[in-house]
């Protein structure tokens, strides 16, 4: 009976060297970015990476309530990461899970390294991220949506944040894992950076790699991050050009 219940591990790298979704090992999923999608937010963005889709909204800087929680030398950055009940195959409980609370903290810490919070003492900046559809990489997609929403709000930043997960599947180092690879691969390593500063803002590793595999994976992540970073900058430039043409 136990043998009947066992699920056979899928082959992740096919005989032609490609992955189950048709990509090469060093290939990103398709990326789509939209800015200013919510008129009632100070800044907002949608970031899509393959089948993973996140929306972020920013409010602030604004007066901190309650006031006794404000800081005299910097803004307080408050971040909420949340997965909508319809974002996965199985409807999830709308109440915040332990994972969502933990990832809210991870994303906040990554954003704090980028936002010039010292320019806005005794204020609060609220960042809300919602996963609309999940297919691996949700923490990074949320982080990038939040980074772009902050830029859309005109909040000064040291740099935009770009990130991607690298991993190992069937012994091959791969870029930008999908859900099947995330579930069945031997390793998963999400990395986010401020590329112009060459500074890592988020780093996690699940699974194991040899030192050589780690170096190969990190180099591949940097390559992917630079591609994503250029797409982020182009999205911001396009919005400014659009505003200028409209006379805003």
Curated annotation (Swiss-Prot):
GO terms for biological process: gene expression; rRNA catabolic process. The keyword Ubl conjugation does not apply. SUPFAM superfamilies: Ribonuclease PH domain 2-like, Ribosomal protein S5 domain 2-like. CDD domains: RNase_PH_archRRP41. Its main location: cytoplasm. Belongs to the RNase PH family. Rrp41 subfamily. This is Exosome complex component Rrp41. It comes from Saccharolobus solfataricus (strain ATCC 35092 / DSM 1617 / JCM 11322 / P2). The lineage of its organism: Archaea, Thermoproteota, Thermoprotei, Sulfolobales, Sulfolobaceae.
